[in-house]
Amino acid sequence: MKRVTLLLVATMLAAVTATAQDWAKARLEKSPRHLEWVKVKHGDRVVNCFIAYPEVKDKAAAVIVIHEIFGLTDWVRGVADQLAEAGYIAIAPDLLSGSAPGGGGTAELGGADAVRKAISSLPPDQITADLNAVAEYVAKLPAGNGKLAVGGFCWGGGQTFRFATNNKNIKAAFAFYGTGPENEADLARINCPVYGFYGGNDNRVNATIPTSTELMKKAKKTYEPVTYEGAGHGFMRAGEDPAGNEANKKARDEAWKRWKDLLKKI
């Protein structure tokens, strides 16, 4: 009886997880835009990337989308599609490419815990090299106008802030609830404005904002954090979920508007 109960619980949890992803998958399936997978190669690395193209007449700016600690999920791919809907070429690299047995990435790692463990093991230099390779790839796209921005969420928000210290071609960095670097020499290399998006109920991350503000001011760099009261960590994803609470939905809508308005300035 105990075994049957455990199996039932496992089945119910799997069903909840599947349902939680349905709304993200549905967006991608209904998108009228050109969406595709590409392989970005550099050295002995192959980075699998999802790219979304806008339906526009003129050449477009590009945005690199850096995934959360959950890896490259349907929701992150949906963010890329929403950026394409707004008129931008959006590319989302799976920075876990090659981390799974057989050379796979996020999808082949087999669960959230395995993904988190793999993320924590990624060498910082490899992350930078992967992102630089992706930046070079989109810079050469015939449909692009050469302008590049980067945006990321959670773990990817921190990596967005960090990547701004390692690539001088970025026109703007959008860090969603991620912590910033604390090395003054690193921050001195930033060549673009950094815009922060934070949930009011996310003290783990928000406790680092004053330090980032002080260090960026000292380095004479632009850093503009905005906190959305009542929202939690991960509000961009949670606010898109039909079952999400109103505070996260409101924060998500306001953050998207701000993001799009700022992208128009690059």
Where are these regions (language model features)?
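A conserved short beta-strand
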Residues: 169-179
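Short beta-strand/loop motif that positions the catalytic acidic residue
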Residues: 190, 196-198
